[in-house]
From Swiss-Prot:
This protein's name: 2-isopropylmalate synthase
Gene: leuA
Domain of life: Bacteria
Subunit-structure text: Homodimer.
Species this chain originates from: Kocuria rhizophila (strain ATCC 9341 / DSM 348 / NBRC 103217 / DC2201)
Residues noted as binding Mg(2+) in the record, renumbered to the chain: D49, H253, H255, N289
Length: 584
């Protein structure tokens, strides 16, 4: 097949490929052969990097709520602000410290630039915290060296080392706070690797790491500039060129400018990183920081404990939306409204069969479904594991098929339609959705089913139906024959009839045939709607009425009445369709 695409006219000449600006050789890379088997150290930066990107930054109440959420989920390193940059951030850090909100096993992280008055203010903010990470940064990229700082490499290194020395100076003034240092060569992805390694090594030397004293070297994709494999290559390269690697916690801070922040973080972790910074649901500057929810639950789907509790994703999402005043997109992995929802008919059918297979396997093995390996098509994770119900898994619109319709009726109302009845009813539903142009809820689905198969005369639904049972009595004439005495409302006229057959259903069909109809039983099935002693029975019959084949359904606390109602349901549908055809 010939490719018919044509040049777009987009100004590609304005942009230089990343490898031309920052060439390096990693032909001996090892990360592609590695697999993640444990969770990284996590650092949530929602209260700093995430907060600074909000249209309306969080007030103190929302900040505290976010902090409490992160602590409750299990994050042990939480960046809480840039206390030297604003009074609001400073006051919040002091609220955390003085209010006793910081657990002993949680380290708060604060950001600072390499200026003495800013560093001094930073240490004033954290004084008294049990554990603190002082995060020093300065930009190292070729672009910012040229257009922002007008500095050469030596000048940029001097900025970083001056900041490191000042941090050590003010650390001496703290009372009871254990400090860990973090250094970020900001805009790392726009920095030559040799220079990034040089400045990180010199900062590490200034911080005097070793002998039990570790530091964090954070390598931010401040702007995502290349494919994730290139970022991973750079992380493995840096790991080989940091002099005291055993005393360094190598950290990632991916942004999502190219839409591959999660992939960059996952590959960078395989490439030797120890730690990942990000935000819940990917909040952050421009296109956001890497999404900690996606990263954590991706690990869970591979059988790796993320060491973060995502078991109530709805509450996590509600809190994040409240604090950020931004909605979580409906398609956001794991947390969005629609991520466990199937509209496609083939998807719905596969999901339904997957659930049924899990239930069968559990019964055969004598264990609970939760003890089995999760294996349901189109659902990479059990929604229940993150606190979601199965109610929203299948939703019905014009693209839906029998599987989705059948699943909702069974899961919500206990109606277990036979396969051919599923096919017939899905056609009824599709006609409705194509006319309405909208999605059908489970409650609407029940209404459509009731009005099609269970016409009511109590005002709760449609009132059509040529035949309606008013009374039933059966007795066995002999072992082979049953006598049915039935009262029928026929088009508004009451009639009493008696018929015989091998059973009640056969007797009623014989009655219709005796009165000039052509009715034959093709299939019959029944089940109870619940396990309680007073449960109703649901019966389904497939009848040939003349040249039509239709299903009927009946429900009653008495199984005989339910089966006869199902016959009446199918005959009524045949009569209705014949009358509508005659009118056309």
């Amino acid at each position: 097949m010939k490719n018919l695409q044509r040049p777009s006219g987009m100004p590609a000449h304005k942009y230089t490929p990343y490898h031309q600006n920052f060439p390096f050789d990693m032909s001996d890379r090892t990360w592609p052969d590695k697999v993640a088997t444990t969770a990284p150290r996590w650092c949530a930066v929602d209260l700093r990097d995430g907060n600074q990107a909000l249209i309306d930054p969080m007030d103190s109440e929302r900040k505290l709520r976010m902090f409490q959420l992160l602590v409750g989920m299990g994050y042990k390193e939480i960046e809480v602000g840039f206390p030297s940059a604003s009074q609001t951030d400073f006051d919040f850090v002091r609220t955390l410290v003085e209010g006793g909100h910081i657990p002993e096993d949680v380290s708060i992280q604060v950001l600072t630039q390499s200026r003495e008055h800013l560093i001094e203010r930073t240490y004033e903010a954290i004084d008294g915290a049990p554990n603190a990470i002082v995060h020093l940064y300065n930009s190292t990229s070729t672009l910012q060296r040229r257009v922002v700082f007008h500095q050469d490499m030596d000048g940029i290194v001097d900025i970083a080392l001056t900041g490191a020395r000042l941090c050590r100076k003010y650390e001496e003034q703290l009372s009871g706070t254990a400090v860990t240092y973090e250094y970020s060569p900001e805009s790392y992805t726009g920095t030559e690797l040799e220079f990034a390694a040089r400045i990180c090594n010199e900062v590490a030397e200034t911080f005097e790491i070793g002998n039990g004293r570790k530091m964090i070297v954070n390598l931010p994709a401040t702007v995502e500039m290349a494919t994730p494999n290139v970022y991973a290559d750079s992380i493995e390269w840096m790991g080989r060129h940091l002099y005291q690697r055993e005393d360094i916690i190598l950290s990632l801070h991916p942004h999502n400018d190219r839409g591959t922040g999660v992939a960059a973080a996952e590959l960078g972790y395989l490439a030797g990183a120890d730690r990942i910074e990000g935000c819940l649901f990917g909040n952050g500057e421009r296109t956001g920081n890497v999404d900690l929810v996606t990263l954590g639950l991706n690990l869970l789907t591979q059988g790796v404990d993320p060491q973060i509790d995502f078991s109530d994703i709805e509450e996590i999402r509600r809190t994040v939306e409240y604090c950020n005043q931004l909605p979580v997109p409906e398609r956001s992995p794991y947390g969005g409204d629609l991520v466990f929802t199937a509209f496609s008919g083939s998807h719905q059918d596969a999901i339904k069969k997957g659930f049924e297979a899990m239930e069968r396997d559990a019964e055969q093995q004598g264990v609970g479904v939760d003890e089995l390996e999760w294996a349901v098509p189109y659902l990479p994770i059990d929604p229940k594991d993150v606190g979601r119900s199965y109610e929203a898994v299948i939703r019905v619109n014009s693209q839906s098929g029998k599987g989705g319709v059948a699943y909702l009726l069974k899961s919500e109302y206990g109606i277990d339609l036979p396969r051919r009845a599923q096919i017939e009813f899905s056609g009824v539903v599709q006609k409705f959705t194509e006319t309405s142009g909208s999605e059908v809820s489970a409650q609407q689905l029940w209404t459509i089913f009731r009005d099609e198969y269970l016409p009511s005369r109590d005002g709760s639904g449609s009132t059509w139906g040529h035949y309606r049972i008013t009374s039933i009595s059966t007795h066995a004439e002999d072992q082979a024959n049953t006598v049915l005495e039935i009262g029928l409302d026929v088009g508004g006229e009451h009639k009493e009839r008696t018929a015989q057959g091998t059973g009640p259903i056969d007797a009623l069909i014989n009655l219709f045939n005796r009165e000039g109809m052509d009715v034959r039983l093709l299939d019959y099935t029944e089940h109870t709607l619940s396990a309680s002693a007073n449960a109703q029975a649901a019966s389904y019959v497939e009848l040939a009425v003349g040249d039509r084949v239709l299903w009927g359904a009946g429900m009653d606390s008495n199984t005989t009445r339910a089966s006869l109602k199902a016959v009446i349901s199918a005959v009524n549908r045949a009569v209705r369709d014949a009358q509508e055809a005659a009118q056309d």
